[in-house]
Amino acid sequence: MVKFKGINHLSMVTGDMDSTIRFWRDLLGMRLVIGWGKPGYRIYFFEISDYDRIAFFEWPGVKPIQEKDAGVAVKGPVAFDHVSLGLETEDELWILKDKLDAAGLWASEVIDHGFIHSIYTFDPNGIALEFSHNIEGIRVHENPIMADSSPSLITLEGSEPQVDKWPRVEKTTPPEERLIYPGFGSELVQQMNKDYQKTGD
């Protein structure tokens, strides 16, 4: 079974990278750890944690989306509702709420969801954001919760992966065939490594 480490990165879109930097780096305090591109096409990554990042593409003509409260149902083509970012302590939830209030930005009251406490806001691009802290003593990883009043038959199979529902791998890719192809950013990082080696000599 594959062991996931977290969300390597989420990729969003902005038409105004400067206001995005002001919010994510300067207000929320997330380091800007990667910046690639040029006018007309950029992608910047902000550090959420040691393993998790959020990225923004900047494309010409992009406008902020219409703000929609998290969890409010809509119809038509849709695949995204909101992003929730975890906080280490309950105090940090209130510290963050105070920062949003001081900045003149809307922030919800602290909401009790039974297993997390949360506040909600929006970033400059209209993205609905939730900031959450796990309630002490509620361990859904150890004791999963299923409170759906009418779960499907597939849901009733349980919380654990049903590995027999997909075809098994019959032939694994041998090491000598594991080719990796260059993608956007690879040349830049290679050049940075060369420059670093030169300065270190």
Positions of PLM-derived features:
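Glyoxalase I/VOC metalloenzyme domain signal
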Residues: M1-I7, V13-I34, I48-W106, F122-D201
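Short acidic/glycine-enriched loop/turn segments that link adjacent beta-strands
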Residues: K38-R42, H113-H117
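Ligand/cofactor pocket segment of small-molecule handling proteins
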Residues: G40-Y41, F45, D50
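Histidine-centered metal-chelating micro-motifs
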Residues: I43, W106-A107
